[in-house]
Amino acid sequence: MRKGDYMVISEQIRMLCAKLNISKAELARRLGQSPQNLNAKLKRESFTIEELKKIADVTGVEFKHRFAFASGEEI
């Protein structure tokens, strides 16, 4: 799902799971939460920056958050 020209975080998390060949249930287990809780967060798009950092940590990737202009400039 896309909103405007950006990908919503839930889609990024689903793509991350697919690329790592892990289920959302496995991600939830690694995060120490129930699959139902993770699915609810994905549905609501309700992740804190700290939760996103933890997702990155438990999956071995780097989380980068920044503002990006249409020109490609990021801050």
Regions found by a protein language model. Give the residues of each.
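Alpha-helical residues within the helix-turn-helix
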Residues: 18, 29, 57
